[in-house]
């Protein structure tokens, strides 16, 4: 079975990898990595459909749940944990589940990816509902933990999606929308942390970013819902206000304070020259979309 997967096959360009110079190794890795973005581009239609599903979940109060084992699980967690500071959402809104739990983030947990019962328990522990979207991630497209999770999600009526790096992936059968990015053989045979992992990260970036834009977390190309939890982010928040309104730093700082540290509110207050209360009301009526609040 494994030998049929392109991610497990040997790469003809690197048959003598151990004899290459460091420069040659880096060159071939770079050349192979350049093929990843092209492979992802061929799946944009499916990624778009999946994003629309995620947006629909968010709009009805649902969540985005990533599931994976090993590198795939870690990438899901990586994308999930960046959403609160970047888009100002609750940490529960986007979550990453990895076979074997948090220990598996830094250590291999033997047998975890083959444990189908564990997937169901993990989803039950977060109270999965029909409003949620579950996206299973597996380079091979056949990880039992992920398949079991998708199967359970479908049973309770949740939306399901999958990301694999082989065509005709097993997990695609359990997904409402499947993304199959064919990255081909790795330079190091079977090491799917390389091209396959890069492809998965690119797709996850697209899904979370486009979905958040779809629910009003971005104005122009600015992170207007950024959570300023430290000095650097507070300075970034003020710069965002400056970029969005063309005011100087002192004015941005003054409105940032007046808006109680809420970038969106400060922007609306400046551009419409209105009170904090009016800006807040406009944003609420516009479901958080700054552009709509300004109309």
From Swiss-Prot:
Keyword terms, alphabetized: Carbohydrate metabolism, Lyase
Pathway: Amino-sugar metabolism; N-acetylmuramate degradation
Domain SIS as annotated: residue spans: 54-217
Pfam family, one: GKRP_SIS_N
GO biological process entries: amino sugar catabolic process; N-acetylmuramic acid catabolic process; peptidoglycan turnover
NCBIfam families in the record: N-acetylmuramic acid 6-phosphate etherase, PRK05441.1, PRK12570.1
Family to which the UniProt record says this protein belongs: Belongs to the GCKR-like family. MurNAc-6-P etherase subfamily.
Protein name: N-acetylmuramic acid 6-phosphate etherase
Species, as recorded: Geobacillus sp. (strain WCH70)
């Amino acid at each position: 079975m494994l030998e049929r997967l392109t991610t497990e096959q040997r790469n003809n360009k690197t048959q003598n990898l151990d004899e290459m110079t460091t420069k040659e190794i880096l060159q071939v890795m770079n050349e192979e990595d350049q093929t990843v973005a092209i492979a992802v581009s061929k799946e944009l239609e499916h990624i778009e459909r999946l994003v629309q599903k995620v947006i629909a979940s968010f709009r009805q109060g649902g969540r985005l749940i990533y599931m994976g084992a090993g590198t795939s699980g870690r990438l899901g967690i990586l994308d999930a944990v960046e959403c609160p500071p970047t888009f100002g959402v609750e940490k529960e809104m986007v979550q990453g589940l990895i076979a074997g739990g948090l220990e598996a983030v830094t250590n291999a947990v033997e047998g975890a990816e083959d444990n189908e019962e564990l997937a169901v328990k993990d989803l039950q522990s977060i109270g999965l509902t029909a409003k949620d979207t579950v996206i299973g991630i597996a380079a091979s497209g056949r990880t039992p933990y992920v398949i079991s999770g998708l199967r359970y999600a479908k049973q309770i009526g949740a939306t399901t999606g999958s990301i694999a790096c082989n065509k005709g992936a097993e997990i695609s059968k359990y997904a409402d929308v499947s993304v199959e990015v064919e990255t081909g053989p790795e330079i190091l045979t079977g090491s799917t942390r390389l091209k396959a992992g890069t492809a998965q990260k690119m797709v996850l970036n697209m899904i979370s970013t486009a979905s958040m834009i779809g629910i009003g977390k971005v104005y122009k190309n600015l992170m207007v819902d950024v959570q300023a939890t430290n000095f650097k982010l507070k300075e970034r928040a003020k710069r965002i206000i400056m970029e969005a309104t063309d005011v100087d730093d002192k004015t941005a700082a003054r409105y940032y304070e007046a808006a109680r540290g809420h970038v969106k509110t400060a922007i609306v207050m400046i551009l419409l020259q209105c009170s904090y209360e009016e800006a807040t009301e406009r944003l609420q009526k516009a479901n958080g979309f700054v552009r709509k609040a300004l109309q």
